[in-house]
Amino acid sequence: MIDAIKALNSDPSVDVITVLSKPSSEAIQVKVNSVLRSLDKPVVVLYLGDTPEYTEENIFHAYTLEETAIAALQKSKGEEVSFEPSIKEDVTANFNDKQVGIRGFYSGGTLATEAAMLIKHATGEESAEDEAFVYKSEHHQIIDLGDDMYTQGTPHPMIDPANRLKALESAASDDEIAVVLLDNVLGYGSHKNMAAQLAPAIEKFLAAKKSAGQEVVVLATVVGTDKDVQGYDSQRRILEGAGAVICDTNDQMVRTALNLIGEKVDQPVREVKSFDKTNEDLTVADSLKDLISGELSVINIGLEGFTEALIDQEVDYVQFNWRPSAGGNEELMKVLQFLNHYEGDI
């Protein structure tokens, strides 16, 4: 990350540097902040999962992904950072006394982590230690179905909807559910039409709940742009047609879910602090400069679908078809490794 920051700092076409980090240790944050304070360019930084207590004149410390994006845009225009979170206020539901839970079935860890953070900060419910969940409290569950434990021998959920379809099917029998959260991430490498895959499952889930006499709300957010091959607007329309309420961002989606169950998460109040400018070595290796600005040649190992982006960008590539042995099961891989090198009699 630090090398990338230095490279962006040296690029004259870059006006604002935006840094996104998954949950990190304090020592890592101290090191990264030291580098950021040595830059002259304005910076927006997000240490996802943390509640920022301060911001700086040249470095804006953000709380959520949406705030990060808006802050970066505002800084690029020379404006003061001003962000007000939003909810979908026209969404209502008549939940019964048992329906108090939020369930998030995410295809990736970043949005899942943000959802977990917002729900925890709003409700105060601590998460149990369970590797199957990003967050599992008394009433709420957030799952990253893109985690390694869910993708052993199977494609990532941004490519294959199977695990999320199963999750929605199982959720139909969960009487505690009030709100379901879904993301649909567009772009190269993702499913060509994920919304069409999720739509029947959403319709079936809502119908099952209606038959059981329960109102539930399915919230969905489409992550992408109108330039993505899947079609941003069409993906939103398909999900909305299936009965999902479409939110513009994950931040808005989670806050809307919290509002539906009578909870709210407050934006952190940040004072402006001053720190001495640091004197970090900002030298950028020539190899990194070449990687960023030079022409690429790529070896693509695995899914051939990833080469579509390379073809569209007219990048030279070589495709190498490969998949892990034993479906990625580490124990079976060790057995196969042993047998492949065993020279005795069996």
Residues covered by each model-derived region:
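Acidic/polar, glycine-rich intrinsically disordered N-terminal extensions of enzymes
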Residues: 275-346
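Catalytic-core regions of core metabolic enzymes
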Residues: 1-281
